[in-house]
Amino acid sequence: MEYLLILLVSLVAFFLKGVTGTGTTTVIVALGSLFIDPKLTIVLASFINIFGGLSMVRIDPVPLSVRYWLPISLLMVVGSVAGAMALNVVPNQQFQLILGGAFLLTALWFLFRVPSSLGTRKPPTVAGVMDLGVGTVAGFCGGFIGINAPPLVLHFSRYLDKRRLRRLLILIFIPAAMAQTATFAANGLFDHQVMIWGLFMLPAMFVGVWLGNRTFHHISESMFRRTLGLLLIFVSIRLVLKGISSLAI
């Protein structure tokens, strides 16, 4: 039963990634934490995200300046390593509370944010200070609580259209996922069971990416955000209550 649920989680997560370029970790951690140790879901999400990102590199390769996305990606790696190291020292009960609170904020953001229209504005050619800062913070959040999309999408969607935003997210998530996985392995969190789960997710991952990419130009991203937001509200409340009950014992 556990492996069937993992396949379904993988399909949903990578369908969302195929459409938006992000959301994979959020879905895997949100749904996976219902039947897997919450910490291990973040390790699993980082591992499978390496393959998910690589599978999308050649999908809709709109041009983005290397001087723009590479510095952001490198600082995401730095933040990811710091976040993954922090994950190893935070007690599990506190982690559940932190994760639940973060999900609740993320859910509200997904529900109420309205994307702006960018028209034909050209993308930047060089990363600015704010771009680098947001990349670092997002990397830390991804390594620590498994959520890095909200700060990235909130910031970069102000001046990147749908296609270029998806492209940026695909490119910068791959090195960050590799760094997180390597750090988890060094800290002893990446074990044999996580590897088995990740490899088992691969077939559903490819199907999800394929389906998501096919619907990229035909489905509303705002509907996805609202649906995911409602789901995350339920999961976040459950995690917060579970963390509180664990502290009370």
Question: Where does each model-flagged region fall?
Answer:
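Membrane-interface helix termini and inter-helical loops of multi-pass transporters
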Residues: 84-94, 118-120, 184-196, 243-249
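Residues that define the loop-to-transmembrane-helix transition and helix capping
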Residues: 39, 67, 93-96, 163, ...
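Transmembrane helix exit motif
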Residues: 54-61, 84, 100-123, 213-214, ...
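Hydrophobic alpha-helical transmembrane segments in multi-pass integral membrane proteins
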Residues: 41, 82-83, 87, 139-147, ...
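Glycine/small-residue-rich loop that forms an oxyanion/phosphate-binding "nest" at active or ligand-binding sites
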Residues: 64-110
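Small-residue-rich hydrophobic segments that form or flank transmembrane alpha-helices
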Residues: 3-70, 132-135, 139, 147-205, ...
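Interfacial loop-to-transmembrane junctions
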Residues: 210-234
